[in-house]
A protein has these predicted regions:
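Long, contiguous binding/interaction regions
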Residues: 3-4, 43-147, 154-263
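Secretory targeting and sorting signals
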Residues: 2-43
Length: 264
């Protein structure tokens, strides 16, 4: 991906990001805090019913660092070959959504989905009809079969409504929405050496070694007036898929400000 990246119990796209940078965001998993004084119940950060959001999206959400709640589906229905290499679904061949509470009963959602060309218009139509905005449509790789696109989306408001819209849109693809949680095969690479070179600890995502490195600047979503948690498009992604013999296919994307693009 050439722009900001929305990319996680089993590791999800968000869980892989928190492991090496736990100190950058405070983990919170509150649902409802009750204050008994005077018989008044005060809802805290968890006044969004995340279980209801999971039911609407068709998959339990994982609670991550910074009060981010995520869901992921792998494109296990596709056999993708890029530059002669069979791509693992762990190389961002997926659909994902990250939610973050912004106000009582409200949330911001950022995500993306890998699509075949024939799926793009019908998914876009379903998202727009449900009030979810498309923020980017571009390619992550250039020599793949079948030809693929990556669609990024954004929404704010009632998270249950947003989740229903996402489920409706993803149902227009070939993604098996009822897929079980993926089992992570071991990464057949010298992960310790790569950790030293990258300067962070990678995480096994479906047999792919992934690094999510938060940007140093605070990234503000000016429409909802919040600083984005680094799990929501505020990190650089590097992926290493083992090929055997100590070799790897490498892919990823950089989150950058405009003045950083040419130097990088």
């Amino acid at each position: 991906m050439t722009g900001p990246h929305p990319r996680r119990p089993r590791a999800t796209p968000a869980q892989r990001r928190r492991q090496g940078f736990r100190g950058l965001a405070a983990a919170t998993g509150l649902t409802v805090v009750l204050a008994m004084a005077g018989g008044t119940a005060l809802a805290q950060a968890g006044d969004v019913d995340w279980n209801a959001v999971g039911r609407a999206i068709g998959r339990p959400l994982h609670t991550e660092a910074g009060d981010v709640h995520t869901a992921e589906w792998l494109r296990t229905d596709l056999r993708v070959v890029n530059a002669g290499v069979r791509e693992s679904p762990g190389m961002e061949l997926n659909a994902e959504a990250s939610f973050h509470r912004t106000a009582p009963g409200k949330a911001l959602m950022i995500g993306e989905v890998t699509l075949k060309g024939s799926e793009v218009n019908r998914v876009a139509d379903a998202l727009r009809q449900g009030g979810v905005e498309i923020t980017a449509l571009h390619k992550h790789i250039q020599d793949e079969t079948p030809r693929l696109w990556w669609m990024h989306y954004w929404a704010q408001g009632d998270p249950v409504r947003i989740a229903r819209t996402l489920h409706t849109a993803l149902a227009r693809t070939g993604i098996p929405l009822d897929q079980p949680e993926a089992v992570r095969p071991p990464v057949a690479l010298d992960t310790a050496a790569l950790d030293r070179v990258i300067g962070a600890k990678g995480e096994d995502e479906n047999g792919v070694l992934q690094y999510h490195i938060p940007v140093t600047e605070k990234i503000t979503d000016t429409r909802v007036h919040i600083t984005l948690p680094y799990l929501m498009e505020a990190s650089t992604l590097l992926m290493f898929q083992p090929l055997g013999g100590g070799r790897a296919a490498v892919n990823g994307d950089f989150a950058m400000t405009a003045d950083q693009v040419n130097p990088v």
